[in-house]
């Protein structure tokens, strides 16, 4: 029983030191936010937005017809972030690859710990 507690304590200390020593690169870079008054609004959307003087009790009239798109080519997507095959940003790939060894070591030691506890349980029977 004492060996099980000692093994648990050693494993906890080791895994804690691994997690504390690993670099924390999970920070999301802050992007510049644009307030609605600063951005340019397209003429198609402008009638749908309420003016600043409109109270919340008024409703915006809905249009029965949608404006026709200028470009008939639906497959052409002007924003690559919304493309179906868009890859994640390079910064997120770099942070994942830098954490891979620590995560692998963590799972190896967790597996060894579980196996040793199983052996202790079997030997106690």
Curated annotation (Swiss-Prot):
Keyword Cell membrane assigned: yes
Residues of the signal peptide: 1-21
Chain segments carrying region Disordered: 20-95
Prodomain residues: 99-125
Biased composition, class Low complexity, residue ranges: 20-36, 77-95
GO CC annotations on file: plasma membrane; side of membrane
Record's subcellular location: Cell membrane
Lipid attachment locations (GPI-anchor amidated serine): 98
PTM (free text): O-glycosylated on the hydroxyproline residues.
Record bears the keyword Protease: no
Entry membrane topology: Lipid-anchor; GPI-anchor
Biased composition (Polar residues): 53-66
Primary location: membrane
Entry keyword set: Cell membrane, Glycoprotein, GPI-anchor, Lipoprotein, Membrane, Proteoglycan, Signal
Family note: Belongs to the classical AGP family.
Function: Proteoglycan that seems to be implicated in diverse developmental roles such as differentiation, cell-cell recognition, embryogenesis and programmed cell death.
Protein name per Swiss-Prot or TrEMBL: Classical arabinogalactan protein 27
Origin organism lineage: Eukaryota, Viridiplantae, Streptophyta, Embryophyta, Tracheophyta
